[in-house]
C-alpha cells in the first residue's frame, strides 16, 4: 500500500512551482535504490512466471487447488509491473509525476493486489481445512471449475474493498497519498489485513489441532495403549498381503505388527485422489498391545489382499503419493502465510498506530518507509519458499529452466 507520510508534504507540494525541486537522495544513493528495487522487480516477475508455468505443465502440481497459487502469482506479477515501478519513481523523485488520474488507479491497484494476496491465503487455508476435515465429501466437489469460482470471488471481494474509497477521493497533481482520515485508515487496515489474517491464523491452528489429534491416534495404534477413538479418528493402514501365522518368537510378531502400523496415514485415504476411491475394502481388526488383556478397538481400514503389480496396488500407491503431496503443500502454504504476515504486519501496525495517535507515537519516517518496502518484497519470496520447501516445485522449476535453455 502506497503511503509516504511526511510532516511537511503539503507545504512542499505548494512550493513545487515556486522553486526547483531537489531529489531527496544523492545520486549514488538513488542508483543503489534503483538497482535493488529493479532486482526485486525482476526476481518477482521471473519467479512467479516460473510458478505459473510449473503448475500448468507439471503433472505433480496439476491438482485443482494449485490454481490458487497461479492466481496469487498473477497478483504478485501485477504488483511488480503496475505498482512497484511507480512507487520507485515517487520515492526517488520525491513527488508524484504521473498526474491525479493515474494516481487514483495506482493507489486502487496497490490496495487491490495487497488485499487480494491475503484473501487468496484465506481461501487457501479454508480449502486445506475442508480437505482435512471433510475429505471425501469436499474432494468430490474440489473441481477446477469450483476453484476458479472461488478465485473469482476472491478478486471480487478485493475489488469491492479497494476501489470505491480510492477512486472517489480527489488527489493532488504533484502528490499521490492515500486517504489519511482516521476512519479510513483503521477500516482499510482491518478489512485488508487484520481480519483476513485472523481468519487465516485461526483456520491453520484448527488444521494443526486436527493433525495432532490424528497423530495421537497413530501413536495409540502403534503402542497398543487403551484409548477410545473419537468418531472422526480413523487409523488407515495399508498391508499388501496377509500372512498366515507361523511359529515364531514374540519379538518377530511384534516387529511384524510394528511394520504394519508404520504405514498409518494421518489423513483419510480419499483426501487427495478421488480416483483411488473404490480401490480399498475395509474390515475391522483389533489392535492389541503386547502383554495386555483385551483392548478397545480402533477402526482400521485394511487394503484387500493384492497381488504385486495389480491395479488396486497401483491405485493405492497413487493415493499414498497424493496424500504425501497434500501434506507437504499444507506445510509449504503455512510457511507462505507466516512470511506474508511477517512482511506486512510492521507496515499495517505502524500505519494504524499513526492514525490513532499521530506522529508522536509513530516510527521515524525512514523506518516506516522500510516497513513499506518490506511489504513489497513479499511478492518475490513465494517462489523461493516453494523452491526451498517443496520437492515437486524444485523438479518442475528445473524442468522448465532446462527446457527453456534447450530451446535457446
Swiss-Prot record:
Membrane topology: Multi-pass membrane protein
Name of protein: Alpha-2Da adrenergic receptor
Keyword Nucleus found: no
Site feature location: Implicated in ligand binding: 110
Residues of the site described as Implicated in catechol agonist binding and receptor activation: 188, 192
Function field: Alpha-2 adrenergic receptors mediate the catecholamine-induced inhibition of adenylate cyclase through the action of G proteins. The order of potency for this receptor is dexmedetomidine > norepinephrine > epinephrine > oxymetazoline.
Family, per entry: Belongs to the G-protein coupled receptor 1 family. Adrenergic receptor subfamily. ADRA2D sub-subfamily.
Keyword Hydrolase: no
Residue spans crossing the bilayer: 31-55, 68-93, 104-126, 148-170, 182-205, 333-356, 370-390
Superkingdom of source: Eukaryota
Species assigned in the record: Danio rerio (Zebrafish)
Cellular component annotations (GO), alphabetically ordered: plasma membrane
SUPFAM superfamilies, A to Z: Family A G protein-coupled receptor-like (SSF81321)
GO MF annotation terms: alpha2-adrenergic receptor activity; epinephrine binding
Gene for this chain: adra2da
Pfam families per the UniProt record, alphabetical: 7tm_1
Amino acid at each position: 500500500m502506497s503511503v509516504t507520510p511526511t510532516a511537511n508534504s503539503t507545504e512542499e507540494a505548494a512550493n513545487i512551482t515556486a522553486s526547483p525541486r531537489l531529489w531527496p537522495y544523492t545520486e549514488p544513493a538513488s542508483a543503489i535504490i534503483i538497482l535493488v528495487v529493479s532486482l526485486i522487480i525482476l526476481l518477482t516477475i521471473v519467479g512467479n512466471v516460473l510458478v505459473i508455468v510449473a503448475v500448468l505443465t507439471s503433472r505433480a502440481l496439476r491438482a485443482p487447488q494449485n490454481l490458487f497459487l497461479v492466481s496469487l502469482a498473477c497478483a504478485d506479477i501485477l504488483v511488480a509491473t503496475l505498482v512497484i515501478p511507480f512507487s520507485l519513481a515517487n520515492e526517488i523523485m520525491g513527488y508524484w509525476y504521473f498526474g491525479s488520474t493515474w494516481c487514483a488507479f495506482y493507489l486502487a491497484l496497490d490496495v487491490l493486489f495487497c488485499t487480494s494476496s491475503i484473501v487468496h491465503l484465506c481461501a487457501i487455508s479454508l480449502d486445506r481445512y475442508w480437505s482435512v476435515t471433510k475429505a471425501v465429501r469436499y474432494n468430490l466437489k474440489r473441481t477446477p471449475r469450483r476453484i476458479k469460482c472461488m478465485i473469482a470471488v476472491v478478486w471480487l471481494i478485493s475489488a469491492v474493498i479497494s476501489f470505491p474509497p480510492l477512486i472517489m477521493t480527489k488527489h493532488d497533481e504533484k502528490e499521490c497519498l492515500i486517504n489519511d482520515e482516521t476512519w479510513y485508515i483503521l477500516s482499510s487496515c482491518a478489512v485488508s489485513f487484520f481480519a483476513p489474517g485472523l481468519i487465516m491464523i485461526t483456520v491453520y491452528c484448527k488444521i494443526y489441532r486436527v493433525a495432532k489429534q490424528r497423530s495421537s491416534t497413530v501413536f495409540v495404534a502403534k503402542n497398543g495403549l487403551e484409548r477410545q477413538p473419537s468418531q472422526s479418528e480413523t487409523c488407515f493402514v495399508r498391508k499388501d498381503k496377509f500372512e498366515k501365522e507361523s511359529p515364531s518368537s514374540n519379538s518377530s510378531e511384534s516387529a511384524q505388527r510394528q511394520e504394519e502400523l508404520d504405514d498409518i496415514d494421518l489423513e483419510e485415504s480419499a483426501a487427495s485422489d478421488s480416483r483411488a476411491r473404490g480401490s480399498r475394502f475395509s474390515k475391522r481388526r483389533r489392535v492389541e498391545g503386547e502383554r495386555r488383556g483385551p483392548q478397545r478397538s480402533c477402526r482400521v481400514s485394511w487394503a484387500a489382499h493384492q497381488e504385486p503389480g495389480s491395479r488396486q496396488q497401483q491405485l493405492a500407491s497413487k493415493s499414498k503419493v497424493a496424500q504425501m503431496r497434500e501434506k507437504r503443500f499444507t506445510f509449504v502454504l503455512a510457511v507462505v502465510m507466516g512470511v506474508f504476515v511477517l512482511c506486512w504486519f510492521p507496515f499495517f501496525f505502524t500505519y494504524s498506530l499513526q492514525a490513532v495517535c499521530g506522529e508522536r507515537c509513530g516510527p521515524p519516517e525512514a523506518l516506516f518507509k522500510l516497513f513499506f518496502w518490506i511489504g513489497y518484497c513479499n511478492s518475490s519470496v513465494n517462489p523461493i519458499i516453494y523452491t526451498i520447501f517443496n520437492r515437486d516445485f524444485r523438479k518442475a522449476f528445473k524442468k522448465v529452466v532446462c527446457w527453456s535453455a534447450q530451446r535457446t
